[in-house]
Curated annotation (Swiss-Prot):
Belongs to the class-II aminoacyl-tRNA synthetase family. SUPFAM superfamilies: Class II aaRS ABD-related, Class II aaRS and biotin synthetases. InterPro entries: aa-tRNA-synth_II, aa-tRNA-synth_II/BPL/LPL, Anticodon-bd, Anticodon-bd_dom_sf, His-tRNA-ligase, HisRS-like_core, HisRS/HisZ, HisRS_anticodon. The keyword Cytoplasm applies. Homodimer. Pfam families: HGTP_anticodon (PF03129), tRNA-synt_His (PF13393). This is Histidine--tRNA ligase. One of its GO terms (cellular component) is cytoplasm.
């Protein structure tokens, strides 16, 4: 029997893991700069947290992993981060705290979709949710943070695409106008769009089907149905983005994929080799009713998410590295059991002072050990043989200059601290 990974998943090997750790560290540091606190929620939720009795997105309908536990309770692996964060916000009564709640998250999500390049059934996301304010300034800050996350990584021509769906009243008026426009040509729409016309008509604007694209060329658009309050909100967001010199483009057909969005929706784009027109790296938007739907008080929110696999792929395509080449500080070369025991003792002392060190564990000869030291690009090699043991010294060799000196075992730590 072959034991292989589950379809749509992947292994992160040690060389790749360093890139993941570097990106995670970068993201956490940036969120901290903006005064966001990390929240960690379970990877599975009771299904009613995900499958709420409102309009369901295509993703929730088709792509979630649902199962029953041994007590016959319905559970769902989280397909995205927002629902679990809001559930936790309500359950833990974070809304009782004064002021705005600013949260960020990072972790795996699960969707049963067709695996393809850049798309997986288990995938990593990071994102944020800001709860408790209707002010356009929060929209602008969240967009700023999303933009800066990508811009500071060094990707080219980073920009924001955004739109407004308006408040509930504006969105309802637009939704009906779109249904009225498309119903006469329903039979000409793709199968997916025909299904969406009933439960999620706004997503038809995002269709990639050529027939759909032609049919919606003259469709009504959300911006044309904004009431005065919604228009003022969107204008204020644009004004603040202008003040921060954040480049943006109004995309009148941008709706995003989740049904709870209202008012501002946005995506972050960058020019990336090989990505072509599919250069959106992440996005999000504002929501008005999600907290209330999950049992909390009437609380507005806004958030975004980025797929980490896609972002790491973009960095690789552009030749941007977040890590330095892996390099040991020292590598011990020994010749027998006694010298190996002494090396292990010395190595423990060095490691306790955060000096990166390793030793051979295969009882190999000098040449294989030397080859291993050079493979790890070790800065120094420490050689211990019978003579060194008898005299309580080591041979310390600089691999760059090839200079070799004799150092007392008692002063080895201090010597290395000076040299490293």
């Amino acid at each position: 029997m072959n034991y292989i990974k589950v379809k749509g998943t992947y292994d992160v090997l040690p060389t790749e893991a360093e890139n993941w750790v570097a990106l995670e560290s970068y993201v956490r540091k940036l969120f901290k700069t903006y005064n966001y606190g990390e929240i960690r929620t379970p990877m599975m939720e009771y299904s009613n947290v995900i499958h709420r009795e409102t309009e369901l997105s295509d993703m929730v309908i088709k792509e979630t992993y649902n199962f029953k536990d041994k007590s016959d309770r319905d559970l769902t692996l989280r397909p995205e981060g927002t629902a679990g964060v809001i559930r936790s916000y309500v359950e833990n009564k974070l809304y009782a705290q004064a002021g705005v709640t600013k949260l960020y998250y990072m972790g795996p999500n699960f969707r049963y979709e067709r695996p393809q390049k850049g798309r997986f059934r288990q995938f990593m996301q990071f994102g944020c949710e800001v709860l408790g304010s209707n002010e356009p300034s929060i929209d602008a800050e969240v967009i700023e943070l999303a933009y800066e996350t990508i811009y500071r990584l060094g990707l080219k021509q980073v920009s924001v695409k955004l739109n407004s769906l308006g408040d509930d009243a504006s969105k309802a008026n637009y939704r009906q106008a779109l249904i009225d426009f498309l119903t006469p040509v329903k039979d000409k729409l793709s199968k997916d769009s025909q299904d969406r016309l009933t439960h999620n008509p706004l997503r038809i604007l995002d269709s990639k089907d050529t027939a759909d694209i032609e049919l919606i060329k003259n469709a009504p658009l959300p911006l044309d149905y904004l009431n005065e309050t919604s228009k003022q909100h969107f204008d204020s967001v644009l004004e603040l983005l202008n003040l921060m010199n954040i480049p943006y483009e109004i995309d009148r057909k941008l709706v995003r994929g989740l049904d709870y969005y209202a008012h501002t929706v946005f995506e972050i784009h960058a020019t990336i080799k090989g990505f072509g027109a599919q250069n959106a790296l992440g996005g999000g938007g504002r929501y008005q009713n999600l907290v209330k739907e999950l049992g909390g008080p009437d609380t507005p929110g806004i958030g975004y998410a980025f797929g980490m696999e896609r972002l790491l792929s973009a960095l690789e395509q552009e030749g941007i590295t977040l890590t330095s080449p892996k390099q040991l500080d020292v590598y011990f070369i020994t010749f027998d059991q006694q010298s190996r025991k002494k090396a292990i003792q010395l190595q423990h002392i060095l490691r306790s002072e955060n000096i990166l060190s390793d030793i051979d564990h295969l009882n190999r000869g000098f040449k294989p050990q030397l080859k291993e030291a050079l493979r790890y690009d070790s800065k120094f090699i420490i050689i211990i043989g019978e003579n060194e043991l008898n005299n309580n010294v080591v041979q310390l060799k600089n691999t760059k200059t090839e200079e070799q000196v004799e150092v007392s075992m008692d002063t080895l730590l201090d010597t290395l601290k000076e040299l490293l």
